[in-house]
């Protein structure tokens, strides 16, 4: 089980990122638009730098919904390999059957 503080920090980052996503995308579009004057693009860069760092999508870490484990994460199921194995053995994951040949 991951530390509660790490899980909570990641959740805070997730909320911040969703809240600032539209404004961040608008500013990035201005910065990358080569037809605009350099001064306007520079002002957009400064505004982007003033925004909270944890509001960036890149700062979010994929974590297991069950255990909070950050590694060996399956995006489709939103859980780690260990949690997947445990829940799969209990028959809690629909469509997952133990392999036998």
UniProtKB/Swiss-Prot annotation:
The keyword RNA-binding applies. One of its GO terms (cellular component) is cytoplasm. Residues 1-20 are annotated as: Disordered. GO terms for biological process: translation. Keywords: Ribonucleoprotein, Ribosomal protein, RNA-binding, rRNA-binding. Residues 1-11 have a biased composition (Basic and acidic residues). It comes from the Bacteria. One of its GO terms (molecular function) is rRNA binding. The keyword Transit peptide does not apply. HAMAP family: Ribosomal_uS14_1. Belongs to the universal ribosomal protein uS14 family. Binds 16S rRNA, required for the assembly of 30S particles and may also be responsible for determining the conformation of the 16S rRNA at the A site. Part of the 30S ribosomal subunit. Contacts proteins S3 and S10. PANTHER family: 30S RIBOSOMAL PROTEIN S14, SMALL RIBOSOMAL SUBUNIT PROTEIN US14M. This is Small ribosomal subunit protein uS14.
